[in-house]
């Protein structure tokens, strides 16, 4: 029913565009995404399908900087994936508990430092994990590499002015469970705020951005 409703809504937007010439296709795209977010909002204040502009791992330099199989990165990730949240939460929420522990450790200890003037420097995780400092690029690369080194699926989202990590936390059927896990493990940080997910092919991805205090 939701698909049928969205289909007619899209047809309606195209009809609107033919009547109002100033409405661009990009505007329709944005309206469509906004409609999806509104249509899938639920009482848990979850904003589902957060549209992302940019590409995933298309920058070769980002690929080269990733080190998910490096022994030091693996040791770092294992240690800090168990630093927070008792085993009872692992039994309750599963492997996402480890991902959230990593997020919390890196987020709490990271200090923002700009790149050298006129240069976009990508720090490898083996460097970043010692410094615990750098810009959003370095943070995203360390976060993604750490998640991947403990068996998680992560991707780096590249936009013109920002870079951040998204982590796969299940499928769309797990939406309520993951939302509950985030609110349980980050109660003070979330408070009454929304949790933002991104759906891709039925899979559920959550933002592990430096600018957010919780996933």
Annotate each predicted stretch with a short phrase.
Residues 19-40:
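Ser/Thr/Pro/Gly-rich low-complexity linker/stalk segments immediately outside membranes or between
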Residues 22-29, 51-54, 67-69:
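Pro/Ser/Thr/Gly-rich intrinsically disordered low-complexity regions
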Residues 2-17:
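Hydrophobic membrane-insertion alpha-helices, especially the h-region
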Residues 85-109, 132, 138-141, 145, ...:
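Active-site-adjacent structural elements in enzyme catalytic domains
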Residues 33-50, 66-88, 143, 186-196, ...:
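Pepsin/retropepsin-fold aspartyl endopeptidases
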Residues 138-215:
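Hydrophobic/aromatic-rich core segments of domains that either
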Residues 55-131:
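Secondary-structure boundary elements
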